[in-house]
């Protein structure tokens, strides 16, 4: 933007210009103090991508490796897990058990709906490379179904996109943080109705390396406001895009002049004020939520004195629910004190990766420079023709004795031993064994020993699994809070019943309204969010089917061949979604009903034939 355009804007909107200048200063200061960490991120990425650069004493690359054995990529990929930790919700109050079950099912269905599997697949790489990764929860009003307005949105935020407040190592303790993203100028125009055609891209390092004049850098600042809520400020270059002092509040269009009897602004209807008919509006905060519920209201008494009730619609007004916390979740690799990010796997094995590159290059040079050499008498040569037989012209038998071939073969034994040692050192540092990688393990001479070796490696990696579970538990908590705040229509969910049948219900925020001891309404968000440790087996349906087969054969369901036994078995199979299990269970139930009916008929016939037990004997 030209200097005279900046001057024009500063005169026209002094408050906006002052605010923009203040936030840009904070951003530049935070970015400068975070620059070393950003440089380290790019270095770690280069290791994973198999960079040929050979560094010396943490300095710039001075040499290129001829080939790369990418142990960083290999060891990180060995740890990738595609499993998604499933939510476990525990209510604080006994009467909220059913609500907790609905929350669990709502979150479980959101995993597929929001493609959290794809997000997890990306973070399984990013987290060990950079030491941490981030997930952002938002409410997207443009999503939803025919019957719902909006839906949750969960996206990944790359570590290099986030600029933290200097000196603070926990997100929840920060007064503010920044997220930078690359957007097209057309997208900015569509979403925020601001022209940024004259702005330039300032942070090109956060995207793929491809020059484009259509891209700009959008900076978003999240901050804590004076009321304890969350605010948002967004800009692009020298253009303010959005400023929300209360980011989580709701705003509506109201008339600039008209007010109600209680002094509140009159809301616009279809862009027109219903009082004065003008179209001039302003954005005002919508404080109160109106929820319609149904309650049994006593209408009187019947003739016999019993109370007569009727289900009547009741309108409840209470302040809109707000999450009041940052919409971002951090997933650390390994905890590291005095650091926002965790400990990176690349940081741990970088020295070994450099050694492997150097030794691999040294071995290549030795092998490529080795070869065979011919000794000839002085002054003699070999004809260089395409003929099969080459002619060497000699004069005496003594000259023939001087013709020889010398083969020079390099010894790379020690180099290979050293390189293998560096590789094993890297694996040991990360706690990865050959058995864990699925390779041949000479130390494991039986299946039990091999499983023990795998379990040992899994134990070394337990901390990473705990941090992953913690991050997803925090994610599920924020997803619930955002749904409670912004899901104005009930969201359909289906719940698997005890008999394997599906029952359909809704996640309705009206169900989370309670009254305290004084009779005041409040939003019930008193639930504990954790991860179901048994979810891996429960989500592996084939494993559950096999477990049921084993239990059937062992007699856990009862004697094999009896209908009661088959009823229990197929009930469990239906609960675990075995194909056609519901139809088979129905047929088993019909057979069981017929057998019980036959038994009753036989008992009745026996009683008739044998007489009544207390019948008097005939004289």
Task: Identify the role of each PLM range.
Residues 1-57, 127, 135, 141-147, ...:
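C-terminal anchoring/interaction modules
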